[in-house]
């Protein structure tokens, strides 16, 4: 009997030790967000209506049909007049960018946000264990991570990763990478820098599918400080509950729907095809099939399955709408942080997921105020939620991002304390939400679509009065031709 009891106690001790070890490992693998800083350029970088018009007029490959297309697209883009452009574009050098322009653009974003991040948190650059930088369209040597390490004199054993080519979803790729690295490196600090190089990649041709990137993409970025130190959990803004990555690059159609190429005349740019919505929906559905069971209550999932099996009614809804039908996403999610990639993307995701205008407001306003800042866009959306004091302790935030490849990378954060920092929205928060996201382009330049105007009678004085600024006389010849 004593031998049996001894064996039993020994087994029990081993089992309890195992459980304790597993608990400590899981605790150390948590990913906490301590702070984030979004980039805000100076007033001289704003792309107002007139500045945008000047940039468009400088493109010698555009004629009247292209101007009409750009006017219509810009007016309905959901982008306002307060967005920011790269310095070389503002200065009129978009057709001949150089390496110095590219480095200056990303340096300003990276160092500006990192300086503020270190100052806010009190964390020293020498304490950083992991550094991940994601810039899709610019990859110099030495790498951008090396530039940061050199600037801040970081440790020689820092784990540095430079991500390129991941598109608008790159920030979520970086966050997921850090979470995986936290499983190996204990009590670590990690920084993720998410931005894009816009200036050197400005399209100067006339392909409409490639001109879209000029209308949508703007300067911006964000630096985020993360840790797996359990002792700092009380200081965290939020905790990462789960992250799911989906890549459908094996599908040729999906691979080519969002791609960097040269047009027929040799002008480099970023092509967005009509297959993009279909590929995005496919990747998103596959992602949700893995993610939703992780975040929604079992009761909600069972009810959805029962409703789907009992329903025999056929509808014309999209595959995404059909999947979300019957699911109450708000049973496991309070906030929806949709990447502000474009008005159509926000509209479609909001409709398919059954979201209200309140739910999609942060993404709409981020797009209106800052434009599509690529991988940094999600953080401007998150900043809006925080500035509007929406985020309360225990709330869960669903971050949704789509990127070239084609891929969908989503995650769910849990807010660990009430958040109300006005952050990058401080100077303009009282103006939002705006009543209308229509761009004033149509009001000022609607005459371009006026069929009653005799194109051949247009002269320089008449056109300058319409535009409100002087221009190259050859623009008149391009319009007439």
Positions of PLM-derived features:
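Terminal signal-anchor or tail-anchor transmembrane helices
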Residues: 1-28
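Short beta-strand segments
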Residues: 34-35, 134, 164, 191-196, ...
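Hydrophobic pocket-lining "lid/loop/helix" segments that shape and contact the acyl-thioester
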Residues: 27-54, 58, 62-77, 81-88, ...
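Catalytic phosphate/nucleotide-handling subdomain of diverse soluble enzymes
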Residues: 380-400, 405-430
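Conserved catalytic cysteine-centered active-site region
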Residues: 77, 81-84, 104, 135-189, ...
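Short glycine-rich or small-residue beta-strand-to-loop segments that form or flank ligand, phosphate
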Residues: 128-136, 162, 336-337, 399
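Membrane-lumen (extracellular) interface motif
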Residues: 1-8, 122-125, 392
